[in-house]
């Protein structure tokens, strides 16, 4: 069994080694021929990777913040409580009270009639 698979494995390994050597040779040749350009390209590549990591971290943090704020009680929760501690229901309740009180306050026309009489 080892004799059947070993030629295949050795062929695979030799192909991989050949590809690796040719790639390393090409890289070495490019770096030797254009050292400045290669350095600039590598620098840009590294900067892009760093920026991508920072953006991913910021995006992840915002997503976590949004998820932590998500579980809010439904609007019916505020209606069931006699005195809600949140501003909006109290604000609307005060407005309703003020509008109901305004019906007892005489209008400008009624005040003018009272002043003339």
Swiss-Prot record:
Question: Per the record, which residues fall in region Disordered?
Answer: 96-117
Q: How does it sit in the membrane?
A: Single-pass membrane protein
Asked whether the keyword Transmembrane helix is assigned, the reply is yes
> Which keywords annotate this record?
Glycoprotein, Host endoplasmic reticulum, Host membrane, Host-virus interaction, Inhibition of host innate immune response by virus, Late protein, Membrane, Transmembrane, Transmembrane helix, Viral immunoevasion, Virion
TM region(s), chain numbering: 39-59
Protein task? Together with the penton and the other minor capsid proteins (M1249L, p49), forms a complicated network immediately below the outer capsid shell, stabilizing the whole capsid. Three copies of p17 encircle each p72 capsomer in the inner capsid shell, anchoring p72 capsomers on the inner membrane. Required for the assembly of the capsid and icosahedral morphogenesis. Additionally, inhibits the host cGAS-STING pathway through its interaction with STING1 and subsequent interference of the recruitment of downstream components TBK1 and IKBKE.
Q: Which family does it belong to?
A: Belongs to the asfivirus minor capsid protein p17 family.
Which protein, by its recorded name, is this?
Minor capsid protein p17
Q: Supply the source organism for this entry.
A: African swine fever virus (isolate Tick/South Africa/Pretoriuskop Pr4/1996) (ASFV)
Its taxonomic placement starts with: Viruses, Varidnaviria, Bamfordvirae, Nucleocytoviricota, Pokkesviricetes
């Amino acid at each position: 069994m080892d004799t059947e698979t070993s030629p295949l494995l050795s062929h695979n390994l030799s192909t991989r080694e050949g590809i690796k050597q040719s790639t390393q040779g090409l890289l070495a040749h490019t770096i030797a021929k254009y050292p400045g350009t290669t350095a600039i390209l590598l620098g840009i590549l590294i900067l892009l990777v760093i920026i991508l990591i920072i953006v991913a971290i910021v995006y992840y943090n915002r997503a976590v913040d949004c998820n932590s704020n998500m579980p809010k009680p439904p609007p019916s929760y505020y209606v069931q409580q006699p005195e809600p501690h949140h501003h909006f229901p109290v604000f609307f309740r005060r407005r309703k009270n003020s509008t109901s009180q305004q019906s007892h306050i005489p209008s400008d026309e009624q005040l003018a009639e009272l002043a003339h009489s």
